[in-house]
Amino acid sequence: MYQVDFNHPIHVYFIGIGGISMSGLAEILLSEGFTVSGSDWNRSALTEHLEKSGAHVNYGKPQKAENITDDIDLVVYTAAVHADNQEFSRAKELQLPMLSRAEFLGQLMKNYDTPIAVSGTHGKTTTTSMISEILLQANTDPTLSIGGILKSIHGNIRVGHSGLFVAEACEYTNSFLSFFPKIGIILNIEEDHLDFFKDLADIRASFRKFAQLLPADGTLFINGDIENWQEITEGLACRVVTFGTTSASDYYPSDISYNKTADATFTVHSLNGQTRQLTLGVHGEHNISNALAAVALSDLLSIDYRDTAEALLNFHGTDRRFEYKGTINGITIVDDYAHHPTEIAATLHAALNYPHKTLWCIFQPHTYTRTKAFLPQFAKSLALADKVILADIYAARETDTLGISSADLQALVQKEGKECFYFHTFEEIEDFVLKNCINGDLLITMGAGDVVNIGENLLSR
């Protein structure tokens, strides 16, 4: 495998430079004096920022072979790039060194004394952001690579000068097995990405391999609510610390209460028997576990708890995580990235504690594979809303070979006893909302695709 010498800048080309992680890696290289170029289908705020910082970006679909020139020293590509991609094929033809995004990020981690990798089926971006805010509050000068936009740094990347490096670690295509963490976090393990993994056992095996990456002087924080979590940690040389919802874990909460906007206050019970109070600035019960992971890590790093508590109180989430978008005709519009049944349920449970008359959920299913695999679970989770509106399935990297559509999900939601409407276009959905939602209603757009545009379109009308 090609080894990058980060002390000697070269020309790196990113296929898919506009992705949230790829754009962050590109920005790190620009800050270190590298020549950066790349391609993406469409112009975005992320690519425009890179261009202003000195990168050259080629736009268009398909990405063209002539973009790959022999002055490029290294090509970095995402998991979404297939062998028939013209740029990918041309780089192979020219025998240019090539690394996947995960391989490149793994090599970057090696340059830091304390690389921290945050993994789990759900909650990675929120927890990575919580940790980031704590490290910033404590003036530790960390380098951060986040899967969402963190408002306090006006982006998803921060280049620091200490030995701390924090990054999300995604299990899809076993990407996180290319990393070199000293500290690892496993937030949860559930079925997902079944276009790659065979089943839950296959996913658990991948997380076990991730845990085995940690060195003997490292630490793994794992959610003690994960069923048979000991199977993941058995035989590890590193230290293992648990967090969870019950006293069986090393870190756990008690005396939980919520304010009128569903933010939690609770007592944190710690490994050493210490108890401390914590109030979160984000909504929902699921964020208690995320916060406990962040607190446990902060204790390991000997961060003053006053900094930890202040950072978590002032953290109000990243973009697309229960993000307040605005109000139109007295209708509150919130957007959320949830695209898995567990995430949907967590978001809607949080919304139920938020002031509202009728809770509307506009859901855009993400990928045919996931929709087919979790169809009954999606219906049960969506039925937590008072009324549901469905958009067409967002294909992402897939083509429809499964014969599945949002109409199948609509039928199951209706069987759960809830009104469910299905429209093929965003314009139809927007018109329906304006005719049927009333003052005091709460409207959540939900999904990992472009469903966020519905709320933004409504607010601009």
Range-by-range predicted roles:
Residues 39, 58-62, 99-106, 145-148, ...:
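Beta-strand->loop->alpha-helix junctions that form or flank phosphate-binding loops
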Residues 69-74, 163, 439-441:
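Short acidic/histidine-rich motifs immediately flanking catalytic phosphotransfer sites
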Residues 2-13, 21, 25-32, 112, ...:
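Nucleotide phosphate-binding/pyrophosphate-handling subdomain across enzymes
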Residues 35-49:
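NAD(P)-binding Rossmann-fold cofactor-contacting core
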Residues 379-439:
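C-terminal helical cap/extension that packs against the catalytic core
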Residues 12-17, 446:
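Conserved N-terminal Rossmann-fold NAD(P)-binding element of oxidoreductases
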Residues 5, 28-34, 51, 65-68, ...:
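Phosphate-binding loop of NTP-binding sites
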